[in-house]
Each structure stands twice: as structure tokens, then as C-alpha cells.
């Protein structure tokens, strides 16, 4: 299992600034993660996701490209 930032379809981190408090927890559980939170009120970070879930990686950042 792995931890990391959820990604939108455009390759950017999944934002959570204007979402309800449980948004990231719900999104993380939807992909099979155990828990999650809105990091610095900006992006969803998840714990214990299946290895098959694609997460944001600074080395392979496609956001805005």
C-alpha cells in the first residue's frame, strides 16, 4: 500500500480548498484508501491506498503541461 496526493484527470493534485471537511476522506476511501485529509487546505492526501492508484509525483508532474 502507499500514501500520497490524489490526482485529477489533468495531472494536478486534487484540490480541496472550497470543499467540505470530509471531502478528502471520502475521495480517499473511494479509491480504496484507509483515510485522508486536506493538506494545508490545498490538496487531498491519502493513506494506505492500493498500489494501483495513480498518485501525484513531483518527478512525473503533468500539471499545467
UniProtKB/Swiss-Prot annotation:
CDD domains: neurotoxins_LC_scorpion. Its main location: secreted. The modification Lysine amide is found at residue 65. Residues 2-64 form the LCN-type CS-alpha/beta domain. It comes from the Eukaryota. It holds the Pfam family Toxin_3. Disulfide bonds join 12-63, 16-38, 24-44, 28-46. SMART domains: Knot1. Belongs to the long (4 C-C) scorpion toxin superfamily. Sodium channel inhibitor family. Has the structural arrangement of an alpha-helix connected to antiparallel beta-sheets by disulfide bonds (CS-alpha/beta). Alpha toxins bind voltage-independently at site-3 of sodium channels (Nav) and inhibit the inactivation of the activated channels, thereby blocking neuronal transmission. This is Sodium channel toxin 2. The lineage of its organism: Eukaryota, Metazoa, Ecdysozoa, Arthropoda, Chelicerata.
Amino acid at each position: 500500500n502507499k500514501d500520497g496526493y490524489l490526482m485529477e484527470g489533468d495531472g494536478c493534485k486534487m484540490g480541496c480548498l472550497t470543499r467540505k471537511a470530509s471531502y478528502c476522506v471520502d475521495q480517499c476511501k473511494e479509491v480504496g484508501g484507509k483515510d485522508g485529509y486536506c493538506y494545508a487546505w490545498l490538496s487531498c492526501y491519502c493513506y494506505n491506498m492500493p498500489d494501483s492508484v495513480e498518485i501525484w509525483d513531483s518527478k512525473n508532474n503533468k500539471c499545467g503541461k
